[in-house]
A protein has these predicted regions:
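Phosphate/diphosphate-binding glycine-rich loops and adjacent basic-rich segments that engage nucleotide
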Residues: 7, 41-44, 51-108
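A generic, well-ordered mixed alpha/beta core segment in the N-terminal half of proteins
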Residues: 1-47, 64
């Protein structure tokens, strides 16, 4: 829904509820740190905020998405060259498990 809203007139605000960190779906950090920056290069002006985590299988998460119209066009981008590695970053999180499990994952 993000791309059609970016091509539409005006500004849009969307609230999505459900799983934010679930199997077979992009987790919130991927959307925030990879997907949206790629779309930004194409002229899509969108911001996403995590309001509440939603873990599998319970869900209960919530994100808000704000999208500004870009005038109805997308800029082409070329993604054939990776370029220099600028940063490697990771996050370890657990739900309903002892915190030492996340710490152990982070230390690996």
């Amino acid at each position: 829904m993000l791309l059609p809203l970016a091509l539409a007139d005006g500004e849009s605000h969307v609230t999505i509820r459900g799983g934010t960190h679930v199997p077979f779906s992009p987790p919130f950090p991927y959307i925030h740190h990879v997907y949206l920056p790629t779309l930004w290069r194409m002229g899509v002006r969108a911001q996403v905020e995590l309001q509440r985590y939603g873990w599998y299988p319970a869900g209960g998460g919530e994100i808000t998405l704000s999208i500004q119209s870009n005038g109805g066009t997308l800029r082409p981008i070329t993604l054939t060259e990776r370029g220099p590695l600028r940063q490697v970053r990771g996050t370890a999180a657990v739900s309903n498990l002892p915190s030492h499990i996340a710490q152990r994952m982070a230390n690996r």
